[in-house]
Amino acid sequence: MTKYTAVLFDLDGTLVDTAPDLGFALNTLLQQEGYSPIPHQLIRPEASNGSAGLLGLGFNITAADANYLPLQQRFIKLYQDNITRESDLFSGIALLLKQLEDTNIPWGIITNKPAFLTTPLVTQLGLDKRAACVISGDTTAHSKPHPAPMLYACELISQTPENCIYIGDAERDIKAGKNANMTTVIARYGYISSSDNIKDWQADGIIDHPSELLQWL
């Protein structure tokens, strides 16, 4: 019998493919500023890094630049207005969630996305009433890789960290899970760039398709 009694997911790049809408917002902003759009295949690996990563890619700026904040505010508004334009569950996630629910294994979401973006996204995708918990980047005082959101999720779903699997597509996800003593799994199908050496993350496992997670349960 499996020791795992709950599965917790990162959101962008693990549970939901949000790169198309993040890319749409970035390219719309670029075109408004007179620049050419960026190909989707270049945007995708940055999609897990939020506005900082995407604006860095598109405009070659950092948060220290004077025009960063105005561009960030416009980017977020564009994304917010198009948050489920194309975003959808990754292939295989719908079946995985159904199988978890059919076997009474609670599942939840732990993301660094702020609540004002997380809530409409999960609600419009019909996940809000199904997830046992939804932890956003500003739900607790610290975000991933700090263990605080992980431990708070466990508290909400009445599970011990040692009995939880956390699956994500970024190094901070794996660090957060390990910091909370969870079993960690890398979603290699997510937003991982060619420069990421995921073996260095020292996760407990790697999957290339959501269905492979069932082997752990």
Residue ranges and their predicted role:
Residues 15, 89, 107-110, 142, ...:
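Conserved SAM-binding loop
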Residues 13, 48-50, 92, 108, ...:
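Glycine-centered flexibility sites
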Residues 1-5, 41, 101, 115, ...:
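Asp-based, Mg2+/Mn2+-dependent phosphohydrolase catalytic module
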Residues 15, 84-85, 106-107, 138, ...:
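A generic structural signal for short
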Residues 2-95, 101-103, 114-116, 127:
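N-terminal helical cap/lid subdomain that shapes the substrate entry/recognition surface
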Residues 36, 106, 183:
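Residue-level detector of anion-binding/catalytic polar loops
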Residues 22, 47-48, 75-76, 110, ...:
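Conserved short hydrophobic patches within well-ordered secondary structure
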